[in-house]
Amino acid sequence: MNNFDLHRFSQALKCYFMTSRRTWLRYFGIFTLVLFMADLFFTRIQGHSFADMVEWWGLEGAVRTYTSYVEGTAIFGLVFFFIAMLFGASFLFSHMKETRQRTTYLMWPVSNLEKYLVPLVHNILLLGIGTLVAYHLADALRVLLDWMTGRTVIWGSPWFWDIFTRPFDGSVPWEFTAFIVGFFLWFHSLYILGGSLFRRQQFLLTSMAIVVGFFLFVWTVHALVEGSGITRDINFVGWHDGVWHIHWSVYLILVVGYGLIALNYWLSYKIFCRMQVINNKWLNV
């Protein structure tokens, strides 16, 4: 089956969700617990108690300091969201670890593209939405605990969304927004590629490969720049006379970067198409 059928794809999505819903619920519970414990750490364990802050700096100073603690929970929640998305990307095909699971999934009456897109869509949508809901639920539990113990009620959700949407509010050039989105998609595509390539310990091996590749890239670029005598005094972004000035190399980097991102996703799909039912190797090729 080589053609893509939307109705068949939607039925496969529904079937995949029904068979994996317990896993998603378990992830949601774990994420909520981790984020709630992190909220308690930032607001109650590190720093000073609220009563001591009121005694030392007065109510206004205590609220101002406690607000900075809550902002810390929002920053942690945002970092946790991105790490969770990368972690999920590396385990895109975790439902195919065993031979029986692999045989069952590869025999689904859908095309290879549909088999590839089903876990990808679930991974992006369910994991992304689930992590966001888990953060807000953990924030609500912290606020409830603050209210029950007589603390000032300060929500962390507004700061979370302010940081999350800041690159898209028009206050920065669209090139900067494209770079931020591309930076995340680049790592997401790498972890999906690693999750497709490695059969075991996908997240760990992919992370190690990225670190090694990064150091090799930096060393190679440094050697080329030093050997060629190319000037490093390039102002990629400048602000002059109320106007942003973007160097032409930024657009070249964006085009090449998004091209490599598309290549990573395509390679991941090709590796998936070559997966074998019986495989005891560390790689899926």
How should these model regions be labeled?
Residues 1-103, 112-285:
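Hydrophobic alpha-helical transmembrane segments of membrane proteins
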